[in-house]
């Protein structure tokens, strides 16, 4: 059985989720003001904690797959991201939410380059690789 379509779909879904979380939190801001009593300053940190940690670590995290194995690195990234996501859903205050968003950013920084690295190693034929990267790029 050819597992490549399943692998590509999984990697595209991972990349989509990572990028969705950059903007998705903006929809929840009015609710955060009501439920957590968040100030404008705290709202800005809630939005930026994810993006800052993601941007700061994505280049360094890109080499983790080469060092420790791509599959293992992706799983670790997904676990970190998932733990941050679950903890964020249960955050009792804005400080906790900022911290969990930062944890999610760390996981995202691991996931994002690892998905592309896996694609380039699974799809070795030039045309096939170009299509796979194109689909991955479209999902982000």
Across the structure, where does each feature detected by a protein language model lie?
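Transmembrane-helix bundle of Major Facilitator Superfamily
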Residues: 1-140
């Amino acid at each position: 059985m050819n597992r490549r379509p399943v692998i590509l779909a999984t990697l595209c879904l991972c990349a989509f989720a990572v990028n969705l979380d950059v903007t998705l939190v903006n929809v929840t801001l009015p609710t955060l003001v009501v439920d957590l009593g968040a100030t404008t300053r705290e709202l800005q940190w809630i939005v930026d904690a994810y993006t800052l940690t993601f941007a700061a670590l994505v280049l360094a995290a890109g080499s983790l797959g080469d060092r420790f194995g791509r599959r293992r690195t992706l799983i670790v990234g997904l676990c970190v991201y998932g733990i941050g996501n679950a903890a964020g859903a249960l955050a009792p205050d804005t400080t906790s939410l900022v911290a969990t968003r930062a944890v999610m950013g760390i996981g995202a920084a691991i996931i994002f380059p690892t998905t592309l690295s896996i694609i380039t190693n699974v799809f070795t034929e030039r045309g096939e690789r170009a299509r796979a990267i194109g689909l991955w790029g479209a999902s982000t």
